[in-house]
């Protein structure tokens, strides 16, 4: 007998489990009643404004046109599948249409019905023996280059990163080869060294290509992080090479580190007013994908005119926002005038992501600054419910610019 798991059930139960572990309620039944009642009320309040509904207004035009923001090596179809890392393979896509799917290997591994429980707090650092795959200097250099922009690795300390690099192994693939298959157990996390790959998702027995990778990116993390079967099939469309990280090492280092990061940033993220519209499970995902960046006094964080690839939240310190405008006497020596300052809990860098245009201003650190950074893909995927708040801020920005420059600097209107 085949039992189909309803869409959204896994995420719903994961969010509830996290809340139970956080609060340790004495009356579990009463806690469950309050938790799901609150979720229902939040859902009713959001209504059609929820991200992904037909009524959404943000980003549609920019997404359809391809925008001007680099996609970090992964390109999505018109109704993209959305994931938790470098636009990987692990979340459900939009309803799929008919297509000629590639032939799937019939001798695939058994799909998981239930995965083992895992508590990162209870596992000792030396519980598992270290895994080391010897590498040549050339392989090590290529591996470091492939991993330098992987968000999951951003918060690892040097010793943890060294263990990850030691444990990764090279996997050569041929054109047409299936790297992972939807429904299989998660065994490895993969980082792309070279090659192109298509992402296929099957829905109601019908498969569809929902995106592709072009010589960079990573996939396979969510099946390992959340103990769920693979949610997509990744097929090589050219000869290529991958770096794989086994399940044991991934969970020992990455998942444990992620759990520590959750403890550190959960309360901070929950305190941010502009994220109040997110559900608990959505805020936890924000914690999972953010990276930490530290800037020294005077260091540039973003530059006016650059393409936008990240969104920033100030954790500590002070950030100065400046804009260049020729012909004004009150500008600083570098031709820029200060228009704002950001402090703890405030954000910047969202304007270029909301408007799909290059950076409208520059940002510099005043003293030592620590920021939480989120890449553009995660920003679009996770902060949909907050987008209306951010769009309302554009009017405030325009008023400030008119007062300073006599014009709104065309921060919203598309350029020719």
Swiss-Prot record:
Residues 1-151 are annotated as: Dimerization and phosphorylation. 3',5'-cyclic AMP 2 binds at residues 274-416. Four types of regulatory chains are found: I-alpha, I-beta, II-alpha, and II-beta. Their expression varies among tissues and is in some cases constitutive and in others inducible. InterPro entries: cAMP-dep_PK_reg_su-like, cAMP_dep_PK_reg_su, cAMP_dep_PK_reg_su_I/II_a/b, cNMP-bd_CS, cNMP-bd_dom, cNMP-bd_dom_sf, RmlC-like_jellyroll. One of its GO terms (cellular component) is dendritic spine. 3',5'-cyclic AMP 1 binds at residues 152-273. Pfam families: cNMP_binding, RIIa. The modification Phosphoserine is found at residues 83, 85, 112. GO terms for molecular function: cAMP binding; cAMP-dependent protein kinase inhibitor activity; cAMP-dependent protein kinase regulator activity; protein domain specific binding; protein kinase A catalytic subunit binding; protein kinase binding; ubiquitin protein ligase binding. One of its GO terms (biological process) is fatty acid metabolic process. Belongs to the cAMP-dependent kinase regulatory chain family. The inactive form of the enzyme is composed of two regulatory chains and two catalytic chains. Activation by cAMP produces two active catalytic monomers and a regulatory dimer that binds four cAMP molecules. Interacts with PRKACA and PRKACB. Interacts with the phosphorylated form of PJA2. Forms a complex composed of PRKAR2B, GSK3B and GSKIP through GSKIP interaction; facilitates PKA-induced phosphorylation and regulates GSK3B activity. PANTHER family: CAMP-DEPENDENT PROTEIN KINASE REGULATORY CHAIN (PTHR11635), CAMP-DEPENDENT PROTEIN KINASE TYPE II-BETA REGULATORY SUBUNIT (PTHR11635:SF156). This is cAMP-dependent protein kinase type II-beta regulatory subunit.
């Amino acid at each position: 007998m085949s039992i189909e798991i309803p869409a959204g059930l896994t995420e719903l139960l994961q969010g509830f489990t996290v809340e139970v572990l956080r609060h340790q309620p004495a009356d579990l039944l009463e806690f469950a009643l309050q938790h799901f009642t609150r979720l229902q009320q939040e859902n009713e309040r959001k209504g059609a404004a929820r991200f992904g509904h037909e009524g959404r207004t943000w980003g549609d035009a920019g997404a359809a046109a391809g925008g001007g923001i680099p996609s970090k090596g992964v390109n999505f179809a018109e109704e993209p599948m959305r994931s938790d890392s470098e636009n990987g393979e692990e979340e459900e896509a939009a309803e799929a249409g008919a297509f000629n799917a590639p032939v799937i290997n019939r001798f695939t591994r058994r799909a998981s019905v239930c995965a083992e429980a895992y508590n990162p707090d209870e596992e000792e650092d030396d519980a598992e023996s270290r895994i080391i795959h010897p590498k040549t200097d050339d392989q090590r250099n290529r591996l470091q280059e492939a991993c330098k922009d992987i968000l999951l690795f951003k918060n690892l300390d040097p010793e943890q990163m060294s263990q990850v690099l030691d444990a990764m192994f090279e996997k050569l693939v041929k054109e047409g080869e299936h790297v992972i298959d939807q429904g299989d157990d998660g065994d490895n996390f993969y980082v792309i060294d070279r090659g192109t790959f298509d992402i296929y998702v099957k829905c109601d027995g019908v498969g569809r290509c929902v995106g592709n990778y072009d010589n960079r990116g990573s996939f396979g993390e969510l099946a390992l992080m959340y103990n769920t079967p693979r949610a997509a099939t990744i097929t090589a469309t050219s000869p290529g090479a991958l770096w794989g990280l086994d399940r044991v090492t991934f969970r020992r280092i990455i998942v444990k580190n992620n759990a520590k990061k959750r403890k550190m940033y959960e309360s901070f993220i929950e305190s941010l007013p502009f994220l109040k519209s997110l559900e608990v499970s959505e805020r936890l995902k924000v914690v999972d994908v953010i990276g930490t960046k530290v800037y020294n006094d005077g260091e540039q964080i973003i530059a006016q005119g650059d393409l936008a690839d990240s969104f920033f939240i100030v954790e500590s310190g002070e950030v100065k926002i400046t804009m260049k405008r020729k012909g004004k006497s009150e500008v600083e020596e570098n031709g820029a005038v200060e228009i704002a300052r950001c402090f703890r809990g405030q954000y910047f860098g969202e304007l270029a992501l909301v408007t799909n245009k290059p950076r409208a201003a520059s940002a510099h650190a005043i003293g030592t600054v620590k920021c939480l950074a989120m890449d553009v893909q995660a920003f679009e995927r996770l902060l949909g419910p907050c987008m209306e708040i951010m769009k309302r801020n554009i009017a405030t920005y325009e008023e400030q610019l008119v007062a300073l420059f006599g014009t709104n600097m065309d921060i919203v209107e598309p350029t020719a």
